[in-house]
Amino acid sequence: MKKITAAITGVQGYVPNYILTNKELETMVETNDEWIRSRTGIKERRILKGEGKGTSVLGIEAVRGLLKKINIDAQEVDLIICATATPDMIFPSTACIIADKVGATNAFAYDLMAACSGFLYAISTASKFIETGTYKKVIVVGADKMSSIVDYQDR
């Protein structure tokens, strides 16, 4: 029996257009650019704006870009795992929303919620599905819309 080995065959990212700068944060909370940079190294953050736009929007854009980049039809995808701490809603899962919007009609899809380690768990889980022969083409999405849970007034 031939051993199946999982491999990462493509990587794609997506960030929203809106940029929240440290200068803007100065108007929301008692802080300044130098204080933030010296303690965190953060200069700016990308924020997904718009009514009803959730984490799935980030995943949809990234998956569309990935499918185009590696030249795979969405219907060839067997499984989508979305690692997120900020799902759009309890159900349907963010992964199911992504699968639907990108046209991955043959894919199983589920969310894996394990905070910061979620993406690592999702990669590990995906590799096991591939190596056991359960699925061939698996997409792992790591996405969070932290702006939906961050209190910008809390220093």
Locate the predicted segments by residue:
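Conserved "HGTGT" condensation-loop signature of ketosynthase/thiolase-family condensing enzymes
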Residues: 1-78, 102
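Short glycine-rich or small-residue beta-strand-to-loop segments that form or flank ligand, phosphate
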Residues: 78-85
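Acyl-thioester C-C bond-transforming condensing/cleaving domain
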Residues: 2-3, 27, 68-74, 87-155
